[in-house]
Amino acid sequence: MSRVNLAAPANHVVPRAAQEEVQGEYQTASNNWAVAAMASAGAAVGAAVLAMRRRATNTYEAIREDPEAVLAGAGRAMGAALIGAAVAGSANAASLTYDELQSLSYLEVKSSGIAGTCPVLADGVSSKLSLKAGKYEINNWCLEPSSFQVKLPPTEKQQVTEFERTKLMTRLTYTLDAISADLNVGGDGSWTIQEKDGLDYAATTVQLAGGERVPFLFTIKNLLAKGDAGQFLGQFDVPSYRGATFLDPKGRGGASGYDTAVALPASGDDEEYAKENSKSTAASVGTIAFKVAKVNAETGEIAGVFESIQPSDTDLGAKVPKDIKTSGVWYAQISPSK
């Protein structure tokens, strides 16, 4: 039986049309494979994000019902309203103690979500911190929000006002950190806290279900709180979201710019335009309540949950502010005053 030579002759030339046909089929197969791979990866990522969102929601609900049990068991809260991509970034961040956070390098923190988290207490107990009467300092005070809600005005169908969950629009830059305060403990065990300095405000924007976006300054600036070793509450100043030199689209500002809209100089004093023309940077007032859930008497570390209610941005006095309810976890270090 003779063998058949399947090799093409040396002088054989493959037609150009045949080459283009083979290349086209190969490119089509490659594109189909890439699309299928991307679809599969997208489905996997989507499922992972949804799973993390469900875990975050369940954790937040547990915090609301029993904060001490959650902090004692898990150490920190991952809120339901770390919305969208924020959920994935923060859910991957590990719960770390203060010393563990300080030992991390820049590259270890970069793009991990850890920079926006507060330390946790690994060896703390769920009890009050017993302090003698005297003056103390609060350092490295950290507030990490887990939920932002906006109070909606009453409607014809629903006369009772309630807070609506929102979607976070800004990046993971809403955590307040490195805050210092003075603590005065009275002879009866009462606490008086006066906030002094630190990263005590963060510009934040959330979005309602209907698409409306609500900007506000999450803050505890100039907080004056009173209570005891178990819980304390107080009021704080809410600075204007915009400064006096900010100019609106019409070029109007508080300390600079036009007095009225350029196209309506004669109507500048009309009531309809007065609120837009007269810019105000006056501060507002917010309230906040802290509950202690975990302490470490040896290190002076203390942690718990908080809930604050404050007004939103007023667009320099042109809009009626909305009430913002912020819930989350906090951490601080207490030491005798120097």
UniProtKB/Swiss-Prot annotation:
GO BP, sorted A to Z: photosystem II assembly; photosystem II stabilization
Alphabetical list of SUPFAM superfamilies matching this protein: OMPA-like
Location of the protein in the cell: Plastid, Chloroplast thylakoid membrane
GO cellular component terms listed in the entry, alphabetical order: chloroplast thylakoid membrane; photosystem II oxygen evolving complex
Family: Belongs to the PsbO family.
Quaternary organization: Monomer.
One matching Pfam family: MSP
GO molecular function: oxygen evolving activity
Principal subcellular localisation of the protein: plastid
Listed name of the protein: Oxygen-evolving enhancer protein 1, chloroplastic
Keywords: Chloroplast, Manganese, Membrane, Photosynthesis, Photosystem II, Plastid, Thylakoid, Transit peptide
Organelle transit peptide: 1-93
Organism: Euglena gracilis
Free-text function comment from the UniProt entry: Stabilizes the manganese cluster which is the primary site of water splitting.
